[in-house]
Amino acid sequence: MTTSFAAAALRDPKLQIPNYHGLRSSSAASSLSRNALSVPSSTRSSSLIRAVSTPAKSETATEKKRSKVEIFKEQSNFIRYPLNEDMLTDAPNLSEAATQLIKFHGSYQQYNRDERGSRTYSFMIRTKNPCGKVSNQLYLTMDDLADQFGIGTLRLTTRQTFQLHGVVKKDLKTVMGSIIRNMGSSLGACGDLNRNVLAPAAPIVSKDYLFAQETSENIAALLTPQSGFYYDVWVDGERFMSAEPPEVIQARNDNSHGTNFTDSPEPIYGTQFLPRKFKIAVTVPTDNSVDILTNDIGVVVVTGDGGEPQGFNLYVGGGMGRTHRMETTFPRLAEPLGYVPKEDILYAVKAIVVTQRENGRRDDRRYSRMKYLIDSWGIDKFRNVVEEYYGKKFEPFRSLPEWEFKSYLGWHQQGDGGLFCGLHVDNGRIAGKMKTALREVIEKYHLNVRLTPNQNLILTDIRAAWKRPITTILSQAGLLLPRYVDPLNITAMACPAFPLCPLAITEAERGIPSILKRIRDMFEKVGLKYNESVVVRITGCPNGCARPYMAELGLVGDGPNSYQIWLGGSSNQTSIARSFMDKVKPQDLEKVLEPLFYHWKQKRQSKESFGDFTVRLGFEKLKEFIEKWEGPAVPPTRHNLKLFTDKDTYEAMDGLAKLQNKNAHQLAMEVVRNYIASNLNGKGE
């Protein structure tokens, strides 16, 4: 589609681009040629090619029931109308249809749920940053936009992106345009299409890591919408797209096996896009920083002799979202699909996406994720259908070593003479002194940034001579080396929840600091050491954005001021937790958790994690511990650290601590740690 036509479509919302049905099962689409734009098979690995064709669709099938969102998509002129009209009005909010469509552009309409009375609307903008890469220019732009148009903070997400909260409707076009013009994008960060593609954020210069990151960027490019709606709405049709690798263009255009809508501005998505959100992660063996098994597609680099990438293992069918008290909805781990040579990865991913596009449910969005399709069909049938779109049989899944959670916090060698520094950001919220210090360092040393799937941030390409001054600046703002951060905090995550998320039913980000402090107090009470930890994740609703169902201890919003407790995930995020107890009030957490921590301390096997312990003993036994709990049998030895020698100092510290939801001892220890870190001036790690 030409830029002039796109601009005309924006000026005249009634001007229609020819309509292409989003499903091949529709009779109108059945006559389209399936072999246009085909690519000679010689450009790909020729092993195991077989003659295949897309399964025939019934011409007489009655039209299936569709959800309201499917109707909005069909009538939207490729995600333009009525959003383009709504953006021209003075109303502070969007219509129902436009509220759904703006998600495809990377934004959600929200309102402050702490306020009573009339709603104060604003918008959250989420960027799209494959493998978490953020240029120096884009970071500084986002920092500016947060102050000028947001709430003064940046939020790092569990999918390696930024969230900018509090943008009012009249400023949306300015903010979106600024992001686009400064090497950023929010296209496809939300909505029924492929979301941000994850990959290990660490800038390690090795063949496998570099190949994983390149692959994530290529998959993201392959599945980026092509019809121009994003640029039409926000920058009047002007395109700001970087040149794509030829293999991406070739894979997108290939229609050898009936994957594409010919002559459509959206060759992969059509008018209907996907039934629901779609998530992909790429990684290397052992590195599970991306929670690989929680994605619709998990892609794992397989290397040969000398570390040279040879191909990929593929997992399919992961997903977190569920609905309380509906057993037909559930979190699910991805399972092995097969292996593909490296030159075929884009074709294999496209075949999986098209299988979901054609067969995922569009009548009830609670069951529209690909995990439900695979659960219904079984992996063998799913594999067979994907192979028909792929044009080959998948090779056997290659063996892999054990997965590990890797945070990449602290100082590390990149492998090219430079250093990178991983910084822990509690709940991904960059604010206050931390925000100021990060800007100072990133701007002064012209650093690029990587965002991690654990809501943290990595500064990259640092010269050795800069390590000491950078450490000093960061530590003075509370950005500490990992040994000064409570181990509970390092692996903990929470979604934003209240006050802005419309789906939240209880606190998450605002509640987790006090909950982690209480868990630390419980650890001390039952005799667990400071360096011991459990993976804690909290969400304000059952959608599971912070992936609580993979945690050793997951707290999931279960009504106002209450949580559903999930137990049994593993510390390396390879097993799924199970629902343990419903409707637990925050004030009752000690009654439930303290006996569990005590018996873990007393009855665990050598190096047994809390999650593994809860699985081994079983929920019946754990509930028995809770019912019979009367406190620790023997009070543990406590360190008697007398930090305060006079009452005035204590009262002053206590007053400051209460402002930060801490006690005097906790704040004093934090001050001491900051002082020590500051005076180390970057010595050691």
Swiss-Prot record:
GO CC annotation terms, alphabetical: chloroplast nucleoid; chloroplast stroma; sulfite reductase complex (NADPH)
What is the catalytic activity of this protein?
hydrogen sulfide + 6 oxidized [2Fe-2S]-[ferredoxin] + 3 H2O = sulfite + 6 reduced [2Fe-2S]-[ferredoxin] + 7 H(+)
Cofactor binding note from Swiss-Prot or TrEMBL: Binds 1 siroheme per subunit. Binds 1 [4Fe-4S] cluster per subunit.
Any idea which positions bind siroheme?
C545
**Residues where [4Fe-4S] cluster binds:** C495, C501, C541, C545
Recount the PTM note: Phosphorylated; this phosphorylation reduces DNA-binding.
Cofactors (names): siroheme; [4Fe-4S] cluster
Keywords per UniProt: 4Fe-4S, Chloroplast, DNA-binding, Heme, Iron, Iron-sulfur, Metal-binding, Oxidoreductase, Plastid, Thioether bond, Transcription, Transcription regulation, Transit peptide
Cross-referenced Pfam families, in alphabetical order?
A: NIR_SIR, NIR_SIR_ferr
Annotated GO biological processes are: negative regulation of DNA-templated transcription; sulfate assimilation; sulfide oxidation
Which segment is the transit peptide?
A: 1-51
Q: Where in the cell is it found?
A: Plastid, Chloroplast stroma, Chloroplast nucleoid; Plastid, Chloroplast stroma; Plastid stroma
GO terms for MF: 4 iron, 4 sulfur cluster binding; DNA binding; heme binding; metal ion binding; sulfite reductase (ferredoxin) activity; sulfite reductase activity
- Broad class of the protein's primary localization: plastid
Listed PROSITE patterns: NIR_SIR (PS00365)
Identify the InterPro entries for this entry.
Answer: NiRdtase/SiRdtase_haem-b_fer (IPR005117), Nit/Sulf_reduc_fer-like_dom_sf (IPR036136), NO2/SO3_Rdtase_4Fe4S_dom (IPR006067), NO2/SO3_Rdtase_4Fe4S_prot (IPR045169), NO2/SO3_Rdtase_4Fe4S_sf (IPR045854), NO2/SO3_Rdtase_FeS/sirohaem_BS (IPR006066), SiR_ferredoxin-dep (IPR011787)
Name the enzyme group at the top EC level: oxidoreductase
User: What are its E.C. numbers?
Assistant: 1.8.7.1
Can you tell which superkingdom this protein's organism belongs to?
A: Eukaryota
Query: Subunit arrangement?
Result: Monomer. Interacts with ferredoxin.
What family is this protein classified in? Belongs to the nitrite and sulfite reductase 4Fe-4S domain family.
Q: What is this protein called?
A: Sulfite reductase [ferredoxin], chloroplastic
Q: Which organism does this record belong to?
A: Pisum sativum
